[in-house]
Regions:
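Basic, flexible linker segments flanking DNA-binding modules
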Residues: 14-20, 41, 49-147, 243, ...
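C-terminal domain-tail junction helix/linker
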Residues: 230-234, 256-306
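Residue-centric detector for conserved, function-critical "anchor" positions
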Residues: 1-36, 63-68, 301
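Active-site beta-loop-alpha junctions of metal-dependent nucleic acid enzymes
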Residues: 165, 184-205
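Mobile genetic element proteins and their domesticated derivatives, centered on retroelements
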Residues: 40-41, 51, 73, 89, ...
């Protein structure tokens, strides 16, 4: 008997939630379009009198909270160009309001507002050139570090601009806080691009001797790169052949960058692309919150660890 009562209560709550969602959707559509309330109610399969009864009621505390949260949510959503899903929105809403907000509540509000995050595209696979030298996968997917500048990941990714012209972004990511330590955008995917990235990282973190993990791209297997690592007492680690998951957090960053910025725009010049990448990496390091960093941005997490 007790189970039946609980089941009935749960069913009633679900029905109320569905009705509330329908009413909110009608209200939003009626404000944003020229469609009449009568037609919207007919489409939704509800009585117009029921909708007006709901509309003229006194809003509950929960409803007023939802309205405030929706405003906060939409402000964040617009700022990031419609790229955040419910997890990222929840983190930013918690920080902005100082309230404990359940991610399921944010997901429901997103459905009411008819919004969703962008979908990541699959990464193209490329065949690497014959390596001059290789090393073992010393990192072995241990994607954690006790302090900054202990373990770095690096990789190069491709962008297009103008009339099919290509640009290449080389970056180094710190596994401690997932921050981008250094990056270089160039027109050629060559050794100087990768060498300059490492030099910038060493300038940003003088005296550091981290483990540096990469795939087996020809730049990383070159003798010149190996010498640069040895000169700075850096231990080299490489992914196994065809195992991009061995460099997972780096691949994840590329996906985030492209979904939240690159795929949303058309770039006519190298300078336009460069400006947006620079702005996004600054946003990622300083403002974009991560659940695995206790709801902090990479630089906030790094500062607390200092």
């Amino acid at each position: 008997m007790l189970k039946k009562v609980r089941g009935a209560r749960k069913k009633a709550t679900l029905n109320q939630t569905r009705q509330e969602t329908i009413y909110l959707a009608i209200e939003a559509l009626q404000k944003d379009t020229s469609i009449s309330v009568q037609l919207l109610c007919e489409i939704a399969g509800i009585a117009r009198s029921s909708y007006y009864k709901w509309l003229n009621r006194k809003p509950s505390t929960r409803e007023m909270e939802n309205e405030q949260l929706t405003q906060v949510m939409m402000t964040i959503y617009e700022k990031v160009e419609h790229t955040f899903g419910y997890r990222q929105l929840t983190l930013h809403m918690r920080k902005q309001t100082g309230k404990t907000i359940n991610h399921k509540r944010v997901e429901r509000l997103m459905k009411v507002m008819g919004i969703q995050s962008v979908i990541r595209r699959k990464k193209k696979k490329y065949t690497n050139a014959t390596p001059q030298q290789v090393t073992e996968n010393l990192l072995n997917r241990k994607f954690n570090a006790d302090a900054p500048n202990e373990k770095w990941l690096t990789d190069v990714t491709e962008f297009k601009y103008g009339n099919g012209q290509k640009a290449y972004l080389s970056a180094i990511l710190d596994l401690h806080d997932k921050s981008i330590v250094a990056y270089v955008l160039g027109r050629s995917n060559n050794n100087p691009l990768v060498f300059q990235t490492l030099k910038r990282a060493l300038q940003a973190a003088p005296g550091s001797s981290p483990m540096l993990h990469s795939d087996r791209g020809y730049q990383y297997t070159s003798l010149g790169f190996k010498k640069l690592l040895d000169d700075n007492n850096i231990i080299q680690s490489m992914s196994r052949v065809g195992r991009c998951i061995d460099n997972g957090p780096m691949e994840s960053f590329w996906g985030t960058l492209k979904c939240e910025k690159y795929y949303l725009h058309t770039y006519h010049t190298f300078e336009e692309l460069e400006s947006d990448i620079e702005a996004y990496i600054h946003f990622y390091n300083n403002e974009r919150l991560q659940a695995k960093l206790n709801g902090l941005s990479p630089m906030e997490f790094r500062t607390k660890a200092a």
